[in-house]
Amino acid sequence: MKITIEYSAQIRRTLGVSEETIDLMDSQSLHDLILHLAEKHGQLFKDLILDAEGNLSRMILASVNSVQVQESTSVDLKDGDCVNLMSPISGG
């Protein structure tokens, strides 16, 4: 199944891309996708999006098809889904 991932803010700057499409096996969760992306993009990306337990960091906002996700392990992905990963913008 094909999943489109959109990156915003610091994640986009870290990767140097704003979007990519990934082919996954059927029956994958958002958490599975995040682990796949962490392995694909290396340690800097992994440190940015994962916490010490290997879960999505609380500092990263995730949405699937424009609906914000609170727990990445509870969301099953479907062919054609669009996932957005972003770090909140802060400062003053």
For every predicted segment, state its role.
Residues 1-91:
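Ubiquitin-like/PB1-type beta-grasp interaction modules and other compact soluble beta-rich domains
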